Amino acid sequence: MIPYAAGVIVPLALTFLVQKSKKEKKRGVVVDVGGEPGYAIRNHRFTEPVSSHWEHISTLPELFEISCNAHSDRVFLGTRKLISREIETSEDGKTFEKLHLGDYEWLTFGKTLEAVCDFASGLVQIGHKTEERVAIFADTREEWFISLQGCFRRNVTVVTIYSSLGEEALCHSLNETEVTTVICGSKELKKLMDISQQLETVKRVICMDDEFPSDVNSNWMATSFTDVQKLGRENPVDPNFPLSADVAVIMYTSGSTGLPKGVMMTHGNVLATVSAVMTIVPDLGKRDIYMAYLPLAHILELAAESVMATIGSAIGYGSPLTLTDTSNKIKKGTKGDVTALKPTIMTAVPAILDRVRDGVRKKVDAKGGLSKKLFDFAYARRLSAINGSWFGAWGLEKLLWDVLVFRKIRAVLGGQIRYLLSGGAPLSGDTQRFINICVGAPIGQGYGLTETCAGGTFSEFEDTSVGRVGAPLPCSFVKLVDWAEGGYLTSDKPMPRGEIVIGGSNITLGYFKNEEKTKEVYKVDEKGMRWFYTGDIGRFHPDGCLEIIDRKKDIVKLQHGEYVSLGKVEAALSISPYVENIMVHADSFYSYCVALVVASQHTVEGWASKQGIDFANFEELCTKEQAVKEVYASLVKAAKQSRLEKFEIPAKIKLLASPWTPESGLVTAALKLKRDVIRREFSEDLTKLYA
């Protein structure tokens, strides 16, 4: 009897001790700071914000050159060879471009430095002056990175612009910064040509593709990226390294409200974030391979690639449209980018991780029977273990489930992922756990903004908690200040709450030519530290980790005085398998909220087929009362799982068939909702929901 009792008591005791040690570990500690009174936390390992991880290095081009020389013969930048393009026509007459891609072809660190030096010299030879600005307007690719480093080497400020930006925002960005040279792909060059008469200062265009339209504006000097490099190789120019305080990048936000704002980042700002991130992922180094596919015009991707370049890791370039074996642009039988690259590290925005989760669940549900039961059982066993229970699947049993169930799922992302970095928006706890178990890798949730150069907080490698964004990065102090109007106070129990304010060497200079907005959200305290007021609401856990709980702008007061956090409700409802995207809308003149739901075509059509419901197309199905009721019931279930209040659950919904994409203008390039645009686009539907 004693062995059996021990078999129960020992695991329980170990579970208690492990969970207790996790709770007791201090990841952030309280710190006394200047400025507006509040509750401030710093990283537990650093008493002051870190500016540079390297002595005597204060700018990005210095760091890049040292890294390239140190890792000269190692592979660095990889691009897949394009074998062929094909046009396929679907049954409804729509055409789709499909790509047949080969293996990755690599540049070493040494060859990349040569390419950067050649481009920097070529930039001078075509007439670009140091005091003029360059804009990079293209999808993420190796030429983007080389262009950026080439400009840094000549102390030229780079204006970054999303390739999905609309005409009005594109004109605004280029004209406001008085850009004289634009570096772009052939696709983006066509966009520039359409608005050429509205561009006031552009003189030169460098096309990353050797083949580009011949009818370029006659007032522009148009040349290929290859020719600029050739010109620089034949006429080398000495570097003109910047100072730490010089502006490296003017990064235009993706503009979820109104025209995009240009955030001015110094070399010191970016270097501080790079230095801080270096301390987070253990054993980060030469053996790692990074999958680069998010927009380099987004600070999350730019910072991540800067870190990889510094530590000697390889970077393989891809695209969201060719990422996996089943991606939209991948020709059947061709490997997706992750399968070809087999990366060890990836960044992802929550929307992409949600799609991975939904895709796996759809396949499991479609198989049904024994396969589904096996998956559900294995998942439950691993979930118990990852939540700290010694009665979950550990050791040999974990290995068994990995081999039998999860190995094929891991292959979706190449099979070698050891760390995922999520940022740009809140990640649901459900998705985080699902990816943890099925991909077999921890997800580091980060919190930062363009204005903080991506710096803010980051969850540590061994922190398996969900719903939090970690402790302050070594480059930042994070402070909560009272927002009395919204009912969030630093004196709240059991955890202090308030608006999140970030300070440190990563805080940017402000908005380009927008002093009024800069003064509104940037403050300098009596100690000289710069702070940014984020507009997000958070709370600190006892271990010093931050949790995002609201956003000031997304909170609406209903007719009877209740407050609804739109973002919080959307995050809760998005776990429904029927939801592709969702926007909750609340009108203060009513006592309830409503929602626009972009339905998941695969899931809703699958349900309708099982129910024997006839429909001519998906658009018609979304108007059927049975479909609306089914989706609504799923939303209510998700709301109850997340313990939403009754007034937070949308009373009525409208099902939409067409997806919201950056091209549609309804979401940003980072897939964030453009609420004002969506409200205008669907104003009639919203009015009917309140009728």
From Swiss-Prot:
Its cofactor is Mg(2+). Disruption phenotype: Reduced amount long-chain fatty acid (LCFA). GO terms for cellular component: chloroplast; chloroplast envelope; mitochondrion; plastid. Signal peptide: none annotated. Highly expressed in developing seeds and young rosette leaves. Keywords: ATP-binding, Chloroplast, Fatty acid metabolism, Ligase, Lipid metabolism, Magnesium, Nucleotide-binding, Plastid. GO terms for biological process: fatty acid metabolic process. One of its GO terms (molecular function) is long-chain fatty acid-CoA ligase activity. Its main location: plastid. Pathway: Lipid metabolism; fatty acid metabolism. It comes from the Eukaryota. The keyword Cell wall biogenesis/degradation does not apply. It is an enzyme of class 6 (ligase). Belongs to the ATP-dependent AMP-binding enzyme family. This is Long chain acyl-CoA synthetase 9, chloroplastic. It comes from Arabidopsis thaliana (Mouse-ear cress). The lineage of its organism: Eukaryota, Viridiplantae, Streptophyta, Embryophyta, Tracheophyta.
